[in-house]
C-alpha cells in the first residue's frame, strides 16, 4: 500500500472510514509484509503473516525466516503490551486468542526448524529431500510451498552456523 510518494512504515497511522490503523511492518512471509493494529478493537489485521488456519509459508527468497520470527515476536508484543486479543487474518476465520495463536506460530516454527536441522544432520542435503522427509505427513500438493519455507530455514540455519 502506498500513500503519497512513500510507502508505509512503523509508527504510521492510516485513518479510513472512521478506523485508525497502526502500521506494523512484519517482513518474513515476504519482505514487504505489513500488519495493521486496530487499537480501538484490540485487533490486528495480519494478512498472510498469521492465517486463520494452517501456518504461513516463508516465501524464500523474498521471505526470510529471521525476519518472520522477529515479526511474530513483534505481534506477540502487541498482545502483551497493547492488549490485542483478536487476529483478523487475510485467509480463514477470525481468531480470538491472539497471544495463543502467535505463541503457537513461534513454537511451530521452532519445531520445524529443529526438524530441518535434524534432517540435514541425517543426510538429507537438498531442499526437496528435506521436504520429503520432514513433510511426509503433509499432502504432496503443499510440498512446493513447504519447499519455499525449507529453503528459508536452511538459509537461516546456515546464517547462524547451525549447519
What are these regions (language model features)?
Residues 1-5, 136:
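Acidic/polar short surface loop at catalytic or gating sites that assists cofactor/ion binding
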Residues 118-163:
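C-terminal regulatory/interaction regions
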Residues 6, 13, 20-113:
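Metallo-beta-lactamase
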Residues 4-5, 17, 58-59, 107, ...:
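Short N-terminal micro-motifs specific to bacterial/archaeal maturation
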Residues 11, 41, 82, 123, ...:
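Secondary-structure boundary/capping positions in well-ordered alpha/beta enzyme cores
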Residues 7-8, 163:
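Generic low-polarity alpha-helical segments
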Residues 1, 84, 162-163:
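Intrinsic structural disorder
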Amino acid at each position: 500500500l502506498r500513500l503519497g510518494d512513500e510507502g508505509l512504515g512503523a509508527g504510521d497511522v492510516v485513518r479510513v472510514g472512521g478506523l485508525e490503523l497502526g502500521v506494523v511492518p512484519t517482513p518474513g512471509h515476504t519482505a514487504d509484509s505489513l500488519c495493521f493494529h486496530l487499537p480501538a478493537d484490540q485487533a490486528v489485521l495480519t494478512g498472510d503473516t498469521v492465517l486463520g488456519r494452517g501456518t504461513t509459508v516463508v516465501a524464500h527468497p523474498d521471505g526470510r525466516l529471521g525476519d518472520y520470527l522477529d515479526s511474530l515476536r513483534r505481534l506477540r508484543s502487541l498482545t502483551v503490551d497493547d492488549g490485542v486479543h483478536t487476529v483478523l487474518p487475510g485467509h480463514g476465520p477470525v481468531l480470538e486468542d491472539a497471544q495463543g495463536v502467535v505463541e503457537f506460530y513461534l513454537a511451530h516454527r521452532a519445531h520445524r526448524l529443529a526438524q530441518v536441522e535434524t534432517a540435514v544432520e541425517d543426510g538429507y542435503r537438498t531442499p526437496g529431500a528435506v521436504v520429503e522427509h520432514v513433510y511426509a505427513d503433509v499432502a504432496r500438493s503443499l510440498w512446493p510451498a513447504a519447499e519455499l519455507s525449507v529453503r528459508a530455514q536452511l538459509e537461516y540455519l546456515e546464517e547462524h552456523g547451525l549447519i
